Amino acid sequence: MAQIVIVPAIVTTASVLPFAAELASQLERNDAIELDLAAVTDADVSFLQLVCAARRQAEHDGKTLRLAHPVHAELTALLERAGFLTDIPSADQTFWFHGDLPR
């Protein structure tokens, strides 16, 4: 069973360090992590970079990092602005959206 990690409402460059430490700690202690992004109201590219790095590290370590639910509209807009949706690989599409891109 995956350990659920509630992502804080604000995850920006100014506030990402405590969440990064928590995520690293959870990945060290658990084989499967599920991120709950429902509370996120303010995020920037540092959040996306952290999640991508954690996902790669989890894969490298034979662990699983996934999202509890597909990203909501605000995070979809952030992914778009940051260029993550341009020619998105299917594995990334599955990770962020659990399948099809939103329209």
Language-model regions: role of each:
Residues 1-43, 52-103:
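STAS-like cytosolic regulatory interaction modules
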